[in-house]
């Protein structure tokens, strides 16, 4: 990775599945047997990691803030919200297949995995699947809009 603090390093032999599982293990080590509450700001969703010194325009409109005591459920809910949202124009996924532009100024990749549209070889789901398996949380959630 390009993290300036070298907190996340991907070895050449690591796959995205391995990296995402490691992230779940590290998260479990931090929260195990401790009270925790998690908040995600689903805003300025960029196509690349926030730690990069450069990035592209947001891929979806700002979707709001989500919170949960369960980090796995929170990640799943946030990913599902991004998948359900229309994609914005002028970014890394604007020219991808199956795009439909409408008069509202959005491209519609609704329901598509926008993270895979940007990075087809990345399997982000491996992290939440493994997180559930090791007891970090559950992929089931109830979305309550306020």
What name fits each language-model region?
Residues 1-146:
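Extended, low-polarity segments enriched in aliphatic/aromatic residues
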């Amino acid at each position: 990775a390009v993290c300036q603090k070298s907190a996340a390093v991907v070895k050449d032999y690591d796959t995205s599945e391995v990296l995402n599982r490691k992230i779940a293990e590290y998260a479990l080590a931090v929260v195990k047997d401790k009270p925790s509450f998690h908040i995600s700001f689903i805003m300025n969703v960029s196509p690349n990691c926030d730690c990069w010194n450069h990035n592209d325009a947001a891929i979806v409109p700002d979707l709001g803030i989500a919170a949960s005591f369960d980090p796995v459920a929170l990640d799943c809910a946030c990913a599902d919200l991004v998948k359900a949202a229309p994609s914005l124009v002028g970014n890394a996924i604007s020219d991808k297949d199956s795009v439909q532009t409408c008069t509202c100024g959005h491209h519609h990749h609704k329901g598509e995995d926008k993270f895979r549209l940007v990075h087809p070889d990345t399997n982000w789901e491996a992290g939440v699947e493994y997180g559930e398996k090791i007891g970090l949380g559950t992929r089931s959630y109830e979305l309550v809009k306020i």
